[in-house]
Amino acid sequence: MKISAIIISRNDNYGGHLNERATYAINSAINTYDEVIYVDWNSPTHSLLWDIKDNLQLNGNLKHFIIPPDAAKSLTNYNEHAQLCCEVLARNIGIRRATGDYIISTNIDIIHPKREDIESIINNSDNNTMFTLSRREVTWDIIKEFHGGEMNFQEWDKLRDYIYINSEERVQNEATVTGDNYSIINCCGDFQLAPKHIWNEIKGFEEELIYPLYADTNVQKKSVKHGFNLKAIFNPPMFHINHGSKGWGGGGFAEGINKKANDIHQAVTFQEQTKNPTTWGFSNIEIEYEIL
């Protein structure tokens, strides 16, 4: 069984301490999954990965894609309101090129579960279900206290062992709009797991939704509309490193970083099966990457 994880970001220090959060996240992903795809989208100067590379425990399973600003503008049809880190397009680039039997769409600030726990979810599933895993919060105060007053990226695994047994399930339901039976948990986009055939059938994330908000709920509704099951998982834990910002769509809509949001009714109320083209994820374009 091969498991791939897709992580996206932009080198803009969104939420603060982005490099530090990314280091914990990517190290844990490298450890848990067979393949980790990092897509750096629209970074103003250089990929975030270059800033943290020296603190990563690389072992040859990290694929690094860079979509520079000029390419990002072209791929969003020069829409001035497109999300600065355009999640749906960046995720689809990774999902379309992932080689795993199971694919996880996740975020840059997540400390990932242990391998055996992910395998347990998969082995107890029916191969026709999309899962969303509920996060638990971990703060910098907790991290620094555990490490003796500082950050210790090389002992991320010891930190994970500690917070595994010193945290509680976070059961927080969510409905974005009347009739939303698809979000099922708060922040459902932190960790979405499905067999590759489901991602292929629904053609990844809906590529019209190039603004912040609702794309994660949308992809879960699409899975149901295509005849698949949807389930929330509250244990095993995965951990969101709290950055203290309002968030709202992974791109700072609440803070005004992005000025326009996806329409909630287009994304949730009226979504049926996918409208993505067969070339979703820009499969008709060869995008270079490096393996680290």
Each predicted region: which residue ranges?
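C-terminal catalytic/acceptor-binding lobe
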Residues: 180-181, 186-188, 208-292
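Conserved catalytic core of nucleotide-sugar-dependent glycosyltransferases
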Residues: 95, 113-207
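N-proximal low-complexity "stem/linker" segments adjacent to membrane-targeting elements
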Residues: 1-27
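Cell-envelope/extracellular polymer assembly enzymes that use nucleotide-activated donors
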Residues: 2-6, 35, 218
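Active-site-proximal specificity loops/subdomain of glycosyltransferases
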Residues: 48-97
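Short beta-strand-to-loop acidic/aromatic patch adjacent to the donor-nucleotide binding site
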Residues: 100-113
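Active-site acidic Asp-centered loop
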Residues: 41, 106-109, 206
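Short beta-strand/loop segment that forms part of the nucleotide-sugar
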Residues: 33-44, 65-69
